[in-house]
């Protein structure tokens, strides 16, 4: 048994709390399209406009997680898949005062059995369940949807559908084609609407890929907001209506990965300022 003693190093803790606040401010600027100044420790303030001027590339997969979280009923159970969804939840979704139970399978990479685990959790609670997972995770455990009818486990299933394994963009192999696409990304081209019909789920497709966003607003921020509102509205409707729902959010894995990279660089610049270049 581990026993913690003392209050720890207050200055060390304060530095991390400040860094977290700065990161949230940078993400908020990307999310809301607002101008802001970000306080950075004892060194005064730094205008984060320069740090993130190239970040706002429109809707990305982290926005999907945030939109889902903000549309949850209270109380609610949120089950988030391994791989990129749980990472995006950790990075882009802030704390809430709502009564939300967040669940996930052990580990951050393996995607087997996600649907079954989530619907098993639904069978043990009276809260509305929202499951967020990737398209490969849904494909791997699609037969788990049998529990919707057999166990009377109504659920809202949100698929972040980038047609393959988006997480592998984080590996050096992404620079090598065709092996990267054929053996790592493994695009499948599946249409999940018939799967929803097979298991009696209402189906809704939201195309959030860059080529489909031209009519959603004049700027990237406006287009991102429009799609986020569409995702949030779909989640809200699904919990107001009877039965189970599959909300299929089609995204671009590479574009989302590049946005994550730019956001990470912007946060680093905002936290460290010129010190990072010394």
Label each residue range with its predicted role.
Residues 1-25, 148, 219:
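Glycine-rich, acidic loop regions that bind phosphate or pyrophosphate groups
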Residues 2-12, 51-58, 79, 182-186, ...:
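Hydrophobic alpha-helical scaffolding
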Residues 3, 25-41, 264-278:
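Short amphipathic alpha-helical segments
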Residues 11, 17, 27-28, 181, ...:
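Conserved alpha-helical scaffold segments that buttress catalytic/binding sites
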Residues 20-85, 253:
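Active-site pocket-lining segments that scaffold enzyme catalytic pockets across diverse folds
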Residues 45-46, 66, 88-278:
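Thiamine diphosphate
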